[in-house]
Amino acid sequence: MTDSATANGDDRDPEIELFVKAGIDGESIGNCPFSQRLFMILWLKGVVFNVTTVDLKRKPADLHNLAPGTHPPFLTFNGDVKTDVNKIEEFLEETLTPEKYPKLAARHRESNTAGIDIFSKFSAYIKNTKQQNNAALERGLTKALRKLDDYLNTPLPEEIDTNTHGDEKGSQRKFLDGDELTLADCNLLPKLHVVKIVAKKYRNYDIPAEMTGLWRYLKNAYARDEFTNTCAADSEIELAYADVARRLSRS
């Protein structure tokens, strides 16, 4: 049995509604990398869908009945409620398929795990209250970012040209897996954006300028509507971490 929109000769778009976390005002997009991940996937698929922001402080009764006990993001696909982000991603990739919809899976397995430990290192760094631990935790974050930078600067197999010489060997690709956004980017970029905004605001930490691959990656991401138009406002992200980012003390 298949849910494919093209099954049985039915070429109509499925009915999809994505429910994402609302911001402080109860209406705009809130800080939620998982919501943004699904928002980006649907946008990149080119499928028609509706987006509803959910105010967690006053969740409407009809939404409570739709997905009881579930926080956004979740979606309805032709009336069926789906709540697990990883399973939703897998379902959309298997259901919204070529020729009608683009394949978004990364071709290289390493692209799916690039930057995988950045967010956990960032969380430990930003939640720390002890001044004496700050430098070590900052180094941990920088090391994780550098590992991602190395991956982005290392040519993918298809980029390697036998005629390439010397300092021209570095990768110039736009994203993790090439010049097109993939599921790997939809997972990593929302988290990377949060790290960039919050670390600067609460620890005055900048991603090092010498990480040219990482900055190239971010620059290319910010040039894409699928990313920038699904981001929460910087102030929204900062507010979300106001109680999480602890003030450092010497005690």
From Swiss-Prot:
Coiled-coil regions listed in the entry: none
SUPFAM superfamilies, per the entry: GST C-terminal domain-like, Thioredoxin-like
Sequence motif G-site, location on chain: 32-35
Regulation acting on activity, per entry: Inhibited by F-actin.
Annotated stretches, region: Required for insertion into the membrane: 1-98
GO CC annotations, alphabetized: actin cytoskeleton; apical plasma membrane; cell cortex; centrosome; chloride channel complex; cytoplasm; Golgi apparatus; membrane
Listed Pfam families: CLIC-like_N, GST_C_2
GO biological process, one term: inner ear receptor cell stereocilium organization
Keywords from the UniProt entry: Cell membrane, Cell projection, Chloride, Chloride channel, Cytoplasm, Cytoskeleton, Golgi apparatus, Hearing, Ion channel, Ion transport, Membrane, Mitochondrion, Oxidoreductase, Sensory transduction, Transmembrane, Transmembrane helix, Transport, Vision, Voltage-gated channel
UniProt key word Ion transport: yes
Catalytic activity as recorded in UniProt: Na(+)(in) = Na(+)(out); K(+)(in) = K(+)(out); chloride(in) = chloride(out)
Domain GST C-terminal: 101-241
EC number assigned by the record: 1.8.-.-
Transmembrane segments: 34-54
Top-level class of the enzyme under EC nomenclature: oxidoreductase
Expression tissues: Detected in cochlea, in cochlear and vestibular hair cell bundles in the organ of Corti (at protein level). Expressed neonatal and adult cardiomyocytes (at protein level).
Cellular localization per UniProt: Golgi apparatus; Cytoplasm, Cytoskeleton, Microtubule organizing center, Centrosome; Cytoplasm, Cytoskeleton; Cytoplasm, Cell cortex
Membrane topology: Single-pass membrane protein
CDD domains to which the protein is assigned, alphabetical: GST_C_CLIC5 (cd10297), GST_N_CLIC (cd03061)
UniProt superkingdom: Eukaryota
Free-text domain note: The active G-site contains a monothiol Cys-X-X-Ser motif which mediates glutathione-dependent redox catalysis.
Assembly and binders: Component of a multimeric complex consisting of several cytoskeletal proteins, including actin, ezrin, alpha-actinin, gelsolin, and IQGAP1. Interacts with AKAP9. Interacts with TPRN. TPRN, CLIC5 and PTPQR form concentric rings at the base of stereocilia and may form a complex. Interacts with EZR, MYO6 and RDX; the proteins may work together as a complex to stabilize linkages between the plasma membrane and subjacent actin cytoskeleton at the stereocilium base.
Family of the protein in this entry: Belongs to the chloride channel CLIC family.
NCBIfam families according to UniProt: O-ClC
Job of this protein: In the soluble state, catalyzes glutaredoxin-like thiol disulfide exchange reactions with reduced glutathione as electron donor. Can insert into membranes and form non-selective ion channels almost equally permeable to Na(+), K(+) and Cl(-). Required for normal hearing. It is necessary for the formation of stereocilia in the inner ear and normal development of the organ of Corti. May play a role in the regulation of transepithelial ion absorption and secretion. Is required for the development and/or maintenance of the proper glomerular endothelial cell and podocyte architecture.
Name of the featured protein: Chloride intracellular channel protein 5
Lineage of source species: Eukaryota, Metazoa, Chordata, Craniata, Vertebrata
